C-alpha cells in the first residue's frame, strides 16, 4: 500500500455451496486446460485467449451470477485518507473502518490525491506516499528506524514548496500533528494485537460482511489464511458489526488453505478479473 506494486487492492467474495464451487472450479480447470492438481490463480484465467471463459464466468449462465461481490480499494487514496483520519479527524480511528468517509477529512484527502503529484512531482509524491504508509506500520523489520522523523521532515520540505492552495492548506495542517502520530505509533507498538491502520484487508472484509449482511443476519465467512486476520481482530470486527446493526452477527471467520477450498479459489478468480478491469 502506498509504495506497493498495485494501485488497486481487490477483495472478492462469492456465495455458493461447497459442492457447487468444486464443480465450477473443475469446469474452469477443464476449460483452461489445467494439468495436475495444483491450484490455479487468477493470472491463468486472464490470458487473452481465455476471454470467453471470463465472459462466461461473469455472465448470466454462471453459477456465481448475482452471487459475487468485489470491494476495490484505491491504495493511494486509502493511505491518504487513513493518514488524515488519524491525524486530523480529532477522534480515535479503528483499523477495521474504511477511510475516506469522514466529511471533514475526505475533501482534504481528495485534494492531495487529485492535485499533489502535479505540485510536487511524481518522485517526491511517491516518496511521501511511502512515508505516509510507513508512519503507522510497526510489524516490518525492514522499515526505516525513524518513520515519524522522516515523515515530518518531508512535510516541512513540502510546506516550503509552492502548491495548489487546497494542497498547501492540508500540508500546513499536518505540520502540527506530530504528537498525534507519535502517540498513535506508540500505542500500536505497545499493543501489536491492535488492527493495523494501513492494512486494507480488514476494512475490505468489514465492508464485505456488511454487503452480505443485507441478505442474511448471521454470516459465516470462509477466508484464505492471512496473518492479519488474528482472532483478536476478527472478534473486534464482530463486535463492531453487532453494535452498528442490531441483530446482525458475524458468527465465524474460518481461515483455510486456498489450495483445498474451491470457494476461495473462485473468489481469487473474481478478484483478479476486477483488479484487471480497474
Cite the ranges covered by each PLM segment.
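Phosphate-ester processing/binding pockets and catalytic centers
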Residues: 2-278
